[in-house]
Amino acid sequence: MKNEKDIILKVENLVQTFTIGEDFLFWKNKRKVNALNGISFEVERNKTLGLVGESGCGKSTTLRTIMQLHRPTSGSIYFNGKDMTKLSKRELLKTRKDMQMVFQDPHTSLNPRMTIREIIEEPLVIYNENKILPKTKQEIEKRVNELMNLTGLAKSMLSRYPHEFSGGQRQRIGIARALALNPKLLLLDEAVSALDVSIRAQILNLLKDLQKELSLSYLFISHDLAVVKYMSDKIAVMYMGVILEIAPREILFSNPKHPYTKTLIASIPEIDPEKIKTKTIKLDEPSLTTIRNTSLTPENAPLEEVEKDHFVSKYLFDEMNSLLNKNET
């Protein structure tokens, strides 16, 4: 059992339900969609938890709900021991300075009308105006220069605008902005997926260096298993708003338990033909859609510890396993 002091973020039974559709006069076409189905996980201090899954599985919704950009339908989000779902707006603003987000697309996440200086100093200015983190102009200027050095950006860039930079430079600017308030936890939403492969490695290495230097914790989400493997200490596998498996990186890749995890790992491209994995689940199969509606519900299939630090849900376990066996024959 881990000491609570070693846990910076703890999510318990988090549910996020959205209502979609439209009303027009007497015609109503609305339905509820569960984007998150009672997920639970922990992020340890100075460590990285990778959250992996296909597009649309609920990864980004998880981060936005943790940040309270979407208020959760139910469940708890403990950050440094405080339940964020019960905080007032003022208390939430104070808490958010220790938890910041790096967004997926550096092209759209930076205001094109602001200079780099204005973008990076904006969090400092806002928290100064709200008297949460008072700073003089000189202190703000000093902090901006520190952030430029930390993220490998030249000070000569400060008076320029986002459109003048490459994707990699823009993401460095986004990281500098996220670090402005000296947070303890970064939520990284597909932080390198929009970048060229050559630039991707540079940003990942920068994040690793910053984690060591600043004692940061990361919740790192991606659909790319290779990237998650490189960055993470532990990995959680998500499917349709449900976490199916959590394990340390080495264990997850060497001994995956849930059939969905197995098929994700099998989907990683392999150069050596002798190592090519043949057992996969066709996720668009009609039978999978059917069993998703008739299977054991996520609420009745919590994560269970099958070995030390290795947790697996029974949700869709037997059904997906039968598809694996079917595809093998």
Where are these regions (language model features)?
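Short catalytic/signature loops enriched in Gly
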Residues: 2-7, 20-27, 32, 249-329
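Helix-to-loop junction immediately C-terminal to a conserved catalytic motif
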Residues: 67
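Conserved ABC transporter NBD signature motif
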Residues: 75-83, 95
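Conserved ABC ATPase "signature" region
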Residues: 83, 128, 136-156, 265
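Conserved ABC ATPase signature
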Residues: 161-165, 169
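A short, proline-enriched helix->beta-strand linker immediately N-terminal to the Walker B motif
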Residues: 180-184
